[in-house]
Amino acid sequence: MRNLEDMKKSDNIMSSDAKEGTENIPDIDKVISELVNYASENELIEADDKIFIVNRLLDIFEKNGLAEDSEIIKNSGVQELNNTRPIADILSDCLKIAVDNGLIEDTQLNRDLFDTKVMGAVTPMPSVVRKHFKELYNNNPKLATDYFYELNKACNYIRCDRIEKDQKWKYNSEYGIIDITINLSKPEKDPKDIIKQGKFAASGYPKCLLCKENEGYAGNLSHPARQNLRVIPLELSGEKYYMQYSPYVYYNEHCIVFNDKHIPMKINKSTFKKLIEFTDMFPHYTLGSNADLPIVGGSILSHDHFQGGAYEFPMARAEYVYTFK
């Protein structure tokens, strides 16, 4: 049997561990304040939106209010901060709070669903984004895409901390310079998530990852969250399309232009007209199409779409073998 002194030591150690664990959990009021400041600094929200956004975030964290000694209350609102941390660090604290309070299970899928929900609360409404994009486009198309691309990074739809893990290099082959990339930004699936996904009944809404209904969708075990996704409407050859950026950015400003309707990919004369019309609209961008053949792989053939961006592909640098008129 343990003597009284040993028991006291053990209790002290347990108390110390518990205290240390509590201290490691970020203060929710401070994290909310920092997140709202981040959104303001990155022009995701206006100053008049701050209190409204604080209350949206309190709802997400299932918190009824702020502590009486909260900086937000003491200063009668969210105060501007200097040197706001990168969004990945702020969201890391959000996830620690969510896990500690039992709001989510600590798996990669649940973490992604939750932090996307958080960012959705500070991402501008689609109408706001489209209006500003159009205003900039009327002045200069590049200004419009610059704004839209920076927005996607600021609202964490493009997860820059993950994109940085990708490996890219060039190889000087006998046929010319080859661009080689290894995409490491897609997180590995947690075994717990895989088991749950197998039991989850998908709703069929949205029909695929390229449907317009993804904009603002909360996601679930079989479909990623898209509360921070925003898309820009376009018209190509009389048909309605939308432009968004790829969250994985295989190359600079990797954009996706997808059909308003969930229809299969089909390469025909109209395809080339649409590609040319797009590059007329955005001269600083390239646009291309995957083959409509299943053997090629890698593309969502069930939904008509194109891919492009501000990138010079090796094919554009290749010499002509012959020319014809």
Describe the role of every protein-language-model region:
Residues 2-265:
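Active-site microenvironments that recognize anionic phosphate/pyrophosphate groups
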Residues 21, 266, 284-287, 293-299, ...:
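Conserved His + Asp/Glu catalytic blocks
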Residues 182, 245, 289, 308-310:
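Hydrophobic side chains in beta-strands
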Residues 229-230, 262-287:
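Helical scaffold of the NTase/Pol beta-like nucleotidyltransferase catalytic core
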Residues 255-256, 267-270, 318:
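A short secondary-structure junction signal
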